[in-house]
Amino acid sequence: QKEGPEWIGAEEPYQLLKDRPDVLAFETDPLENDTEVTGEVMIKLWVSSTAVDTDFTVKLVDVYPASEDYPEGYHLNLVDTIQRARYRDSWTEPEMMTPGESVEITITLWPTSNVFKKGHRIRLDVSSSNFPRFDVNPNTGEPVGRHTRMVKADNTVHTGAEHPSRVVLPVIPAE
């Protein structure tokens, strides 16, 4: 998971994706025990934006320790998805955001099953784009596929007691 010259829009110096300024990475310390995660992973984010519509993407990543072959560690994408803000509460009744207002969105990843081995890290990457995997959101609120312009969205993920953004991992207890 490192940019390179083959990446659309990437420029030197190439960096790990988690270190990009448009990616917010949450990562555990190295795990002290094997940890099994099996089922749907749910992410609840409190977010705000300068735009009336925008996207939030999440990736669950198994971060292997550094090795001779991978001096920065190996970063295995397990599952990822996207949530368009206008559809945060309903696919049939879209609702635009009010710029600057905090709202809670729920992002559910497809079911997965992985044993994060001792010494590995669990990482969740949050961004507003995962192009070309998902289409680009013009952030205008215009009808999907019929936009006439694009605007930049400055997005914020809020944390803390008033805005408890969180990840719900289905951890299977060791036997």
Set out the residue ranges of the language-model regions.
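Intrinsically disordered, low-complexity Ser/Thr/Gly-rich stretches
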Residues: 1-175
